[in-house]
């Protein structure tokens, strides 16, 4: 455990994570200073009076006088103020690094462009099914520091690339990169390999690395080694097996579960289940309770969630598809009897949308593109695309056209922040309109 006594600590970024950092230091007899570029950041009213605060900008004077800077994942390490501090030899960490220095129980660590919240939650459910006292959080749910507890027997953390950039003490019992596709390119000017390099930090000092056999970018730089266990659709130690119209989860040739016993559906969710099972096995959880958890887990909201089935039409909310890879995962192997009415749009974060084109070739696809990058998305297949300003306009346009056997899918391939507070608000709006129009 690290000793912070007498240290001049500056925390950048408030919100729930920032407050958890403040509480962490106060509990150790250190009063940090806090700054946030927002004038009235969330959590400002909960900050103890003794804590000095600076809002509306970064305070370079405070930063250059600090012994330790705890940076929110929301601020890029390339920011000139942080670069200057790093050049001056000032240590810069994040909340996950603070957590890793203190945690006494094993950690399962999960990252990836898509599927990480589902897999994190699923491994947590597997641990609970085994009667293990588990703490689940990080980039999902509770900030990691709020999970620190002497009673905890296992931690399951979802970690973003931004969190991993400031973490060096992670020693996971099992770690995975589920997949690597373009995301956050606005934060990674050197492209996909720079983004991948941040993700790869999760494997440093990991006991077992769970890699995706279908995605070479998830492999450690030096290639797979004896620490690696793999999962994949048709390849890998954990894979899918198709026999006589049935699909099974299979581990090293042994069939362990028929997917019809699972509440989750879709090929991307079956591979998520394989990854979760590989992590649970590596963490020493009993296989039987892990499989039981797979049969009861219903999935997370806004992730390929069926919000309405009416008159033979399925309305599916996949608002969490905030990047191209996530929408690809939803479309890959998708079975629709009639026409797919696909809603795309929002803020594409400088991504290349062209990988989606191959899924949009059929006669039974109609595109409804909205938001900041709607025109770019409509250009993928202009002859079947319509462009509107908002998602609501798009849904009112498509509603009279749907027939029994059709599917209406919101899988936007974009962030929501151009028109919504977050992807949850976008998904809730879709669900509300589906119930009104369907």
Swiss-Prot record:
It is an enzyme of class 6 (ligase). ATP binds at residues 112-118. GO terms for molecular function: ATP binding; UDP-N-acetylmuramoylalanine-D-glutamate ligase activity. It is found in: Cytoplasm. It catalyses: UDP-N-acetyl-alpha-D-muramoyl-L-alanine + D-glutamate + ATP = UDP-N-acetyl-alpha-D-muramoyl-L-alanyl-D-glutamate + ADP + phosphate + H(+). GO terms for cellular component: cytoplasm. Keywords: ATP-binding, Cell cycle, Cell division, Cell shape, Cell wall biogenesis/degradation, Cytoplasm, Ligase, Nucleotide-binding, Peptidoglycan synthesis. Its EC number is 6.3.2.9. It comes from the Bacteria. Pathway: Cell wall biogenesis; peptidoglycan biosynthesis. InterPro entries: Mur-like_cat_sf, Mur_ligase_C, Mur_ligase_C_dom_sf, Mur_ligase_cen, MurD. The keyword ATP-binding applies. One of its GO terms (biological process) is cell wall organization. Belongs to the MurCDEF family. HAMAP family: MurD. Cell wall formation. Catalyzes the addition of glutamate to the nucleotide precursor UDP-N-acetylmuramoyl-L-alanine (UMA). This is UDP-N-acetylmuramoylalanine--D-glutamate ligase. It comes from Shigella boydii serotype 4 (strain Sb227).
């Amino acid at each position: 455990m690290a000793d912070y006594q007498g240290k001049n600590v500056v925390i950048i970024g408030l919100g729930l994570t920032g407050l958890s950092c403040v509480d962490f230091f106060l509990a150790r007899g250190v009063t940090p200073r806090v700054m946030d570029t927002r004038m009235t950041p969330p959590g400002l009213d909960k900050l103890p009076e003794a804590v000095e605060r600076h809002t509306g900008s970064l305070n370079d004077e405070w930063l250059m006088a600090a012994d330790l800077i705890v940076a929110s994942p929301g601020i890029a390490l390339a920011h000139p103020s942080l670069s200057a501090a790093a050049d001056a030899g000032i240590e810069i960490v994040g909340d996950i690094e603070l957590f890793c220095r203190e945690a006494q129980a094993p950690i399962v660590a999960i990252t990836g462009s898509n599927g990480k919240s589902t897999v994190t939650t699923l491994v947590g459910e597997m641990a609970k099914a085994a009667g293990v006292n588990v703490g689940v959080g990080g980039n999902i749910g509770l900030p990691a520091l709020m999970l620190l507890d002497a009673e905890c027997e296992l931690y399951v953390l979802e970690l973003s690339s931004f969190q991993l950039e400031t973490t060096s003490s992670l020693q996971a019992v099992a770690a995975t990169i589920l997949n690597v596709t373009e995301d956050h390119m606005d934060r990674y000017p050197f492209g996909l390999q720079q983004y991948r390099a941040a993700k790869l930090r999760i494997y440093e000092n990991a006991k077992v690395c769970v890699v995706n056999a279908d995605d070479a970018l998830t492999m450690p730089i030096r290639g797979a080694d004896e620490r690696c266990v793999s999962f994949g659709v048709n390849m890998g130690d954990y894979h899918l097996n198709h026999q006589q119209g049935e699909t099974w989860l299979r581990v090293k040739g042994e069939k362990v579960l028929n997917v019809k016993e699972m509440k989750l559906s879709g090929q991307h969710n079956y591979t998520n289940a394989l990854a979760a099972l590989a992590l649970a096995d590596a963490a020493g959880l009993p296989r039987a309770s892990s499989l039981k958890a797979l049969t009861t887990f219903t999935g997370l909201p806004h992730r390929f969630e069926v919000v309405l089935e009416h008159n033979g039409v399925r309305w599916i909310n996949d608002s969490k598809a905030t990047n191209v890879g996530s929408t690809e995962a939803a479309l890959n192997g998708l079975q629709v009897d009639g026409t797919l009415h696909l809603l795309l749009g929002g803020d594409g974060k400088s991504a290349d949308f062209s990988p989606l084109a191959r899924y949009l070739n059929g006669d039974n696809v109609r595109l409804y593109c909205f938001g900041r990058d709607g025109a770019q998305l409509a250009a993928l297949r202009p002859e079947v695309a319509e462009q509107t300003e908002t998602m609501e306009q798009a849904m009112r346009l498509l509603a009279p056209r749907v027939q029994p056997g059709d599917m209406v899918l919101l899988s936007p391939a974009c962030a929501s922040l151009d028109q919504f507070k977050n992807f949850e608000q976008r998904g809730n709006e879709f669900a509300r309109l589906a119930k009104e129009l369907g």
